Amino acid sequence: MSGLGAILTAMVTPFDAQLRVDEDGTVRLANHLVAHGSDGLVVCGTTGEATTLTDVEHLRVIELVVAELKGRATVVAGVGSNDTRHAVHLTEKATELGADALLHVTPYYNRPNRRGIVRHFEEVAKATDKPIVLYNIPARTGTDMPNDLLAELAQIDNVTAVKQANPDNLAPVDGLELYAGNDDMLADVLDLGGAGGILVASHVVGEQMRRMVDEPDNRRTIDASLQDVYAAMGATTNPIPVKAALNLLGHAVGGLRLPLVEADEHELAIVRRALESHGLLATASA
């Protein structure tokens, strides 16, 4: 298993009724996830609504989770930015706070060319002695990092892994541990000998996804049984469905900050059906 773990949950950021970061809720959720299948947590990533957190909030969430888990599970801090100086700043601060690794997305919106991408990651790598996990998600960033570019980035000393959310690039790259960036890619990544996944559905079916790692002979059967959950988590923009699911299950993670909005009735029904099909709502209300 990777030093970061196999099942890494991309944790939501709980908010209170005024959409302030719920610090107690953050700690509770972190403990719940680690108790239910997660080897580690990725905080302040896409699912954690990092783009609508202030830097103070962002770093506070990292601080809370690192302090709470205290070596019981790994903490990967999402610190990516399309501003290299800002990414360096967040990297330095997250390193000081004790994060085990740093997740860095491809710079988005300004869409740098290949040389710019390499320079960006060279600069952030200089800012830490911790492992860096690259994050390739062209559907959000507008830029794909093909495997030959990933191989070049792997030459940077502390660039050690990639969260791959482009299924067309799903192949091992020398020098990089491979993590599934989508729930429905986990089985394929594990079959390829990859490290695991950075996942959303593990908020609600973490123990089942853990079994996909521990029981390779049953992996495909388990994966097939979870397709409705994966689909529900993608019923609309992440993290809208997973926050809806957690609230239905009694975890009280609150709403979302604009421009994201809460699930509508149709989306909520999809999420509810998936939870009910696995007996999760019955368990939560028992």
Residue ranges and their predicted role:
Residues 2-142, 281:
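Active-site beta->alpha loop and helix N-cap motifs at the rims of alpha/beta catalytic domains
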Residues 3, 7-12, 32, 36-38, ...:
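C-terminal alpha-helical cap/extension of soluble enzyme domains
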Residues 15-16, 186, 266:
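Short, acidic Gly/Pro/Ser/Thr-rich loop/turn segments
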Residues 26, 58, 150, 265-268:
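Short functional linear motifs
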Residues 53-56, 89, 114-117, 145-147, ...:
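Short secondary-structure transition/capping segments
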Residues 81-84, 183-184, 239:
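Short glycine-enriched loops at secondary-structure junctions
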Residues 123-130, 138-236:
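Catalytic alpha/beta core domains of metabolic enzymes, predominantly
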